[in-house]
Amino acid sequence: MKTSYNEACSRDCSTLEQDLSLCEKAGFDYIEIRLDMLRGWLKDHTVDQLKEFFETHRLKPHAINAVYLRQGMLPDEMPDWNDPAMQDFKLACDVGSTIGSSYVIIVPPLDPSGVFTGDTAAAEKECVRILKKLAVFARPFGMKLCFELVGLRKSCVRSIEAADRIVRAVDEDNVGFVFDSYNIYLNDHCNDFSAIKTVQPEKIFAVHLMSADDVPDSEMGQDKRCFSGSGVVDTDRFLKTLKICGYTGMVSVETFRPEYWSKTPEWVIENAYSTTYTALKKNQCLE
């Protein structure tokens, strides 16, 4: 497996330009670029400059993060490119195909009320419909879609089994998974990752690795993520399960922790690398 850095870790204290330099220095193999930080880059730089960086450095781009689906999206045969989600998708495809990034993270619909109370089967069917359309739009760009289950109660796709049903129903070779250790844990404190063994292994396009604080259910959220090595997520079991499945791809550290955002980007990226590398080495997952 290869080490990767997701820009969410230093979102509020860094820039894409800084992240590129610091990730190269730290030793990361890949970087996951955030769309908001990509737009920040494009204010003063060009896509060709980003392409040139990756052509002349060891660090390479992986998935672009992220496009958020919503119920009723893409109602017509042709996409509405004024739709903010489709603008994100188009930017990810345009830039990704230019710089050598072949993946975009896709997040299922999240209920703005905080709790999904709809019909689960209908919601899964809607995800299948949207993903099928996005797969067609992505194909000319050579992009693959990494569908990410979210274990929070506001999500309509909370489990590995649900995500697997959707990806199998889509049945497109450019639609697969990104498995995120904390998003799996968020579904009823799940530290049993054995369901990953039941998915099509070739469909695991990306992996996100992190742990999280031990807090009451009412306080659980993405801001409680922390680097591997402490916390309540059994990251060892997660990595060992992926290894059993034959996964050898990238493992990207992704946190949304305000405490980290108050640090320097140097501190964040150095610690992100050391903890991720240590976790992979401990579980004999390094290539």
Where do the language-model regions lie?
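Conserved beta-strand positions in the central sheet of alpha/beta enzyme cores
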Residues: 32, 63, 105, 146, ...
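Active-site beta-loop-alpha junctions enriched in small/polar residues
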Residues: 6-10, 34-38, 66-69, 109-111, ...
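Catalytic-core regions built around general acid/base machinery
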Residues: 46-58, 130-137, 195-198, 237-241
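Surface-exposed, active-site-proximal loop segments in enzymatic domains
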Residues: 41-45, 68-87, 109-123, 218-226, ...
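Residue-level detector of anion-binding/catalytic polar loops
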Residues: 29-30, 60, 102, 144, ...
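Active-site acidic/histidine proton-transfer and metal-coordination neighborhood
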Residues: 14-17, 55-56, 74-176
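Glycine-rich, proline-tolerant flexible connector loops at the mouths of alpha/beta enzymes
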Residues: 32-55, 111-115
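Histidine-acidic metal/acid-base catalytic patches
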Residues: 1-4, 9, 13-27, 100, ...
